[in-house]
Swiss-Prot record:
Coiled coil: none
Family matches, as HAMAP family: Kup
Family: Belongs to the HAK/KUP transporter (TC 2.A.72) family.
Subcellular location: Cell membrane
Role description: Transport of potassium into the cell. Likely operates as a K(+):H(+) symporter.
Catalysis performed (reactions): K(+)(in) + H(+)(in) = K(+)(out) + H(+)(out)
A single Gene Ontology CC term: plasma membrane
UniProt keywords, alphabetically: Cell membrane, Ion transport, Membrane, Potassium, Potassium transport, Symport, Transmembrane, Transmembrane helix, Transport
Protein name from the UniProt record: Probable potassium transport system protein Kup
Pfam families recorded: K_trans, K_trans_C
Gene behind this protein: kup
Amino acid sequence: MLHKAEGFDRRKFTMAGILVAMGVVYGDIGTSPLYVMKAIVGDNGGLARVSESFILGSVSLIFWTLTILTTIKYVVIALNADNHGEGGIFSLYTLVRKKSKYLIIPAMIGGAALLADGVLTPAVTVTTAIEGLRGIPAFFERFGNDQTIIVVITLTIILILFSVQRFGTELVGKAFGPIMFLWFTFLGIIGLMNFSQDWTVIRALNPYYALQLLVSPENKLGLFILGNIFLATTGAEALYSDLGHVGKMNIRISWPYIKICLILNYLGQAAWLLTVKENPEMQALAEINPFFQMIPRGILVFGVVFATIAAVIASQALISGSYTLVSEAIKLKLLPRLKIIYPGSNIGQMYIPAVNLILWLACSAIVLAFRTSTHMEAAYGLSITITMLMTTILLLFYLLDKIPAWSAYLISLFFAAIEVVFFFSSAAKFFHGGYVAVGMAVFLLCIMIIWERGNEIKEATAEQVSLKKYVPQLKALKEDTSVPMYQTNVVFLTSDRVDGEINRNIIYSILDKQPKRANVYWFVNVQVTDEPFTQEYSVDMLGTDFIVQVQLYLGFHISQEVNVYLRQIVHDLMKTGRLPKQPQRYSLTPGREVGDFQFVLIQEELSNVSELKKWDRQIMQAKLAIKNLTTSPESWFGLEYSEVKYESVPLIIGPQRKTHLVERKNRS
């Protein structure tokens, strides 16, 4: 089934798709002009220490970074690596994971780094935009260089932004596209106005100036200047991650306009810098932001407001992207289950309360700790270089199936070499605040490792039994009137996907722990497919009319509301005569033919008799501890309003520790 988002076909070029792309895909990269040249000039010692060749070289590096990484790697190559229309590092992983079990490592590292570095985006973009208020005379006269008012305004905007997430962004989201189209047009026009004052700045497109700057003594940072240059392309990974919202055609057709507007703005900033670099008043300024300084004074207020709106939209796109990334990681069993809410009519519109709270707290803490955009820029971008490098590794295995091996290795080596240089040039940021993003990435990676390895240990040692072997006992129990009727339908959620086999604990629960007499025994397993929007099922009744093994096939974008799906399956089976009707004498619904349901959820606790390696035992203990802190199976599977019973069973993994007691004889 073709999935449609926002009311348009993602596979085709449409104006609606173009507008959505501008509102969702380009937010991060579209706000980079707010701070990139500011960071480059500031870290070189200010306006008094930059020359013409330095300015031209900086813009040249920006242009070629956008060309090589954003345009060639992502727009031209990576967008082809879509998983049924979905993009991003986890979707790419699902395409190549059969190549090697070790590919889970770059996928986890890249996903954790992308989530962690994203925390800085709302903080740095909104703070930079609000700092533009200082260029307004009335504001400057009232507050001067007082950073506290900037921090307060920024925190207020961030609080409002995260508070409205629970209500969904479907309505306001429709306005994002047109607003960002106007924003990019504004970037291009303002840039062109200043660029037209010195057309010779076009020389910056010559790569000679980029290479010259890297070895020039005028460049105080040397290769480390690339850490600031990289800020111009941090949104490239988000561009690939948001592929599923709009489709590759809409991104590829809209990108040339976006890039032209961005380059015009950077050229305009360069022309403005060349014009004022000898101005003593400008040189005396403690901090200079070419973006706001080059805007005509008469429309500066408009420019600051517009920049703030663009920063909020960019932050919203990142927040939505974080929800999607976490959701995909959960479906791939890389993160524990979290409560996911769908406030809008679009499946892509989701809200994860836990993620929202963590992002808000982290963003607010960063604003309070770093205070100025200059300090935030010094910390920004490090983790994204790691994500890009991990994407390149996964992309290599994708390309090996599409083009000759030598071409795949050559292309991957080319991008990896560039990204390694960017990584080491950004490494200095670790000591200037980059440790925050790296620390968060390591924390998230540890959770992913614990969860993935814990699942691996459990699945490798889980004791499976043949369900068919117990059909006679289940039939006898069903017909044994001496045992009280437990429920008309008893449902067990199983974690295994082996046909005809289930976990031994389930049979133990039915026959041994408390005999559960029922008319129908249901064993339901959910398999997350590589296709994002699959909604299918299959059944195996083992030749009976009282045992139903249900296999749900749900895409990694689909919520696992088992109760809803089970209702449909019951009616389908009754309609075809495979399941007897269950007429109810007492019901609010006259003629109701479906009986009551009891969902039995088995909770596992690590048994002390399990002989596990010390490391594996710690992994399992950590996994179970994390599991207790996250969403319950009842909430995850949409069973909040169903009859649910929890049963605790010992989780015995590996060989059991043997015990031997000796009877003490009575001594008379």
